[in-house]
Amino acid sequence: MAESIVEKCIERVSNRFKLVLLASQRTHDLNTGASNPIQAAKFKGHKNTIVSLHEIAGKQVDTHELFSLLVGRCKEYMKGNMNNVYSSNTSKLANLLNFSDNTDLDASQESQDYEVDGEIDDEINDQDGDEEVSV
């Protein structure tokens, strides 16, 4: 049954990758409460992904509008994501760039430098998810 729905959708949206994106956007809309009561009764018990494909195949939704909603949602995600990246890494970058070229360092200063380097390495490992596990 799902194959026939996809075949009908391909007649409307020729690119399979675009179809996946459009169905994803429509499913997101349905999950956040955008549905018609008549359609809700018709597809009761079906998952929103199947409902999305049926709507695309039946020309019940405008694919151009779905695509513009998808692009807008991606832009908002990227804008928020980029703001978080820059704000969280500013202090780390400042710590990395805050070094001195003094050659007359005493032993206590050198040990502090090694501790800071170790902390930075730990933070990098935590972000990468490559934490070392001792056995």
Curated annotation (Swiss-Prot):
A molecular-function term among this protein's GO annotations: DNA-directed RNA polymerase activity
Q: Name one GO cellular component term.
A: DNA-directed RNA polymerase complex
Its UniProt entry gives the catalysed reaction(s) as: RNA(n) + a ribonucleoside 5'-triphosphate = RNA(n+1) + diphosphate
A Gene Ontology biological process annotation? DNA-templated transcription
**What spans are recorded as compositionally biased (Acidic residues)?**
112-135
> Enzyme group, top EC level?
transferase
Per UniProt, the keywords (alphabetical) are: DNA-directed RNA polymerase, Nucleotidyltransferase, Transcription, Transferase
The EC number(s) given in the record are 2.7.7.6
Q: Where is this region: Disordered?
A: 107-135
Q: How does it assemble?
A: The RNAP catalytic core consists of 2 alpha, 1 beta, 1 beta' and 1 omega subunit. When a sigma factor is associated with the core the holoenzyme is formed, which can initiate transcription.
Family the UniProt entry places it in = Belongs to the RNA polymerase subunit omega family.
**Role of this protein:** Promotes RNA polymerase assembly. Latches the N- and C-terminal regions of the beta' subunit thereby facilitating its interaction with the beta and alpha subunits.
This chain's protein is named DNA-directed RNA polymerase subunit omega
Q: Which organism is it from?
A: Wolbachia sp. subsp. Drosophila simulans (strain wRi)
